[in-house]
Each structure stands twice: as structure tokens, then as C-alpha cells.
């Protein structure tokens, strides 16, 4: 276990350099997340013979990805960044990867922001193309849940979103302190487990939107559990007592919204 506990001392968050540009493992994992989301979703479309063309779904992917990126960055700036007012008064800096003329990349993404960005982009796409919002998001969440695994692995390799202090033998040293590998917990709980449940249940769904809403519910529950092993963001800390974090608060909101929509849509289907 010694190698595992000291794993951060064995590799660099920067995978390689392209001239003056450092390519981080986080960026590589993000690219793999996008590719896996597309591959998994298209595999299910083909395997389950779903009524949607490749061209239409390819177009949807672009809309969804833009929504995810915009939502993730804006969500972080509004709820997590300690310089929120600066970005509000200098919005052009939100996506500026340069600091004083030096490339530093874009740091700070919020998954909850990405979630709502994805919803908005999906709604706008479906409205424009006259496609069922619930049908297409049922497909999308299969890919999203699989891609999430790579996203959290990216956080792990980037040595960010660290866990709380622990004495468990599988903990890892961060700055000389043994902590929970919370990013791995999240990859398993919020990614792998959710994906397996959705993949297993997809043939048993009784209405369009059931998988999408199940994803929101399952993700929120898994995230709330994982938050108890994850160190609160240093700039925010605990919002209430020593248990309520911004992640838990936002997950509770998603949970309430998705449960509400699930109950309403299920009642409509039963009534009809």
C-alpha cells in the first residue's frame, strides 16, 4: 500500500509539453470523457435500435457539449470562485486561458453548473429541431454517466478536490497528510454505479425521461454520500455546521427537482 499512499509523489499533473503549452492529465481525461460519452451513447442507439439518426445526434452532441462547458465554467465562477465579482465585471476573462500573457489554462469547473448547462442546451436543441427532450436525454445520460468516471479521474490526476483526513489504509498522502481518495469514490459512486444501474434498467423503462430523471436522482444521492468524504472547498468551507457543503446543497436541489418531475411524469403516464 505504500506506493498507493504516496502515489502523488510518483507522477506529475502535467502529462507532457507542446512547446510552451503544458498538457495536463486533466485535459486528457476530459477528452476521454467526451469520446466515451459519444461512443457509449451511439453504442446504445445502435444496439437498442433507437429512432434517431446519426446526423441529428451528432448535431445534438455539439449543442450539449457547448452547454456543458458554458454551464460548468459559469457555475464555478458564480458559486465557487473567490473572485466572482471580478468575473461579473470582467466577463470576457471567464474563458481567458492566459494570465499576464502566459498560458495557464482554464481552472475551475462545476459539475452542477455543467448539469444545468446540459439541460438548457438540450431543451434549446430539442425545441429548434422538434425532437422529444425526454427521449434524447434518456440516451445522453447513458453516455454522461460513463464519461463521469474519466472526469473524476482527471480530478485525481490533477491532485484537486481532495478528500478529508483519514486513517484508512487505502488513503493517499496529500501535502504529507493522509486523506480519503474522494475523487476515486466519486468516480465509482457517481459514475460507474450510476451507469450500471441505468444500463441495466433502460429496457425496463416505462416512459421517456425515466432514465434522465433517474440519473439526476441517483447522481444527487451518490454525490451527497461522497461529499462526506470530500474536503469542502477551501474558499467556501461548510455552509452550515460541519456537514452542509455547496455540493450537498446543489445536489439536494437537483434531487428535489428530479423527484418532482419523476412523480409528475409517472402520474401522467398512468393516467393516460
From Swiss-Prot:
Enzyme Commission number(s) of this protein: 2.5.1.145
Gene Ontology MF: a single term: phosphatidylglycerol-prolipoprotein diacylglyceryl transferase activity
InterPro entries found in the cross-reference section: Lgt (IPR001640)
Residues passing through the membrane, by range: 21-41, 60-80, 101-121, 131-151, 181-201, 209-229, 244-264
Keyword check for Cell inner membrane: yes
GO cellular component: plasma membrane
PROSITE patterns hit by this protein: LGT
Keyword field: Cell inner membrane, Cell membrane, Membrane, Transferase, Transmembrane, Transmembrane helix
Compartments reported by the entry: Cell inner membrane
Pfam families to which the protein is assigned, alphabetical: LGT
GO BP term (any one): lipoprotein biosynthetic process
Main localization (coarse): membrane
Keyword Cell inner membrane: yes
Residues that bind a 1,2-diacyl-sn-glycero-3-phospho-(1'-sn-glycerol): 152
Membrane topology: Multi-pass membrane protein
The protein's annotated pathway: Protein modification; lipoprotein biosynthesis (diacylglyceryl transfer)
PANTHER family referenced in this protein's UniProt entry, alphabetically: PHOSPHATIDYLGLYCEROL--PROLIPOPROTEIN DIACYLGLYCERYL TRANSFERASE, PROLIPOPROTEIN DIACYLGLYCERYL TRANSFERASE
Family the entry assigns: Belongs to the Lgt family.
Protein's job: Catalyzes the transfer of the diacylglyceryl group from phosphatidylglycerol to the sulfhydryl group of the N-terminal cysteine of a prolipoprotein, the first step in the formation of mature lipoproteins.
The protein, known as: Phosphatidylglycerol--prolipoprotein diacylglyceryl transferase
Source organism (scientific name): Aliarcobacter butzleri (strain RM4018)
Amino acid at each position: 500500500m505504500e506506493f498507493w499512499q504516496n502515489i502523488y509523489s510518483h507522477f506529475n499533473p502535467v502529462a507532457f509539453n507542446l512547446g510552451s503549452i503544458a498538457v495536463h492529465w486533466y485535459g486528457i481525461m476530459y477528452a476521454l470523457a467526451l469520446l466515451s460519452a459519444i461512443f457509449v451513447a451511439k453504442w446504445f442507439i445502435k444496439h437498442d435500435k433507437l429512432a434517431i439518426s446519426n446526423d441529428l445526434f451528432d448535431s445534438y452532441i455539439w449543442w450539449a457539449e457547448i452547454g456543458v462547458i458554458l454551464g460548468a465554467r459559469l457555475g464555478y465562477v458564480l458559486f465557487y470562485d473567490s473572485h466572482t465579482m471580478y468575473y461579473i465585471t470582467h466577463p470576457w476573462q471567464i474563458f481567458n486561458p492566459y494570465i499576464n500573457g502566459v498560458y495557464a489554462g482554464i481552472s475551475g469547473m462545476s459539475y452542477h453548473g455543467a448539469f444545468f448547462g446540459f439541460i438548457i442546451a438540450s431543451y434549446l436543441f430539442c425545441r429548434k429541431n422538434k425532437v422529444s427532450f425526454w427521449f434524447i436525454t434518456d440516451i445522453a445520460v447513458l453516455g454522461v454517466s460513463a464519461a463521469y468516471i474519466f472526469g473524476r479521474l482527471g480530478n485525481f490526476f490533477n491532485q484537486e478536490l481532495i478528500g478529508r483526513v483519514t486513517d484508512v489504509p487505502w488513503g493517499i498522502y496529500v501535502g504529507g497528510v493522509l486523506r480519503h481518495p474522494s475523487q476515486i469514490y466519486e468516480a465509482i459512486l457517481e459514475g460507474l454505479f450510476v451507469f450500471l444501474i441505468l444500463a441495466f434498467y433502460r429496457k425496463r423503462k416505462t416512459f421517456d425521461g425515466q432514465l434522465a430523471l433517474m440519473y439526476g436522482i441517483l447522481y444527487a444521492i451518490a454525490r451527497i454520500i461522497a461529499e462526506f468524504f470530500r474536503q469542502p472547498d477551501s474558499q467556501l468551507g461548510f455552509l452550515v455546521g460541519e456537514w452542509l457543503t455547496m455540493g450537498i446543497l446543489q445536489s439536494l436541489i437537483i434531487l428535489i427537482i428530479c423527484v418532482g418531475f419523476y412523480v409528475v411524469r409517472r402520474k401522467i403516464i398512468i393516467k393516460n
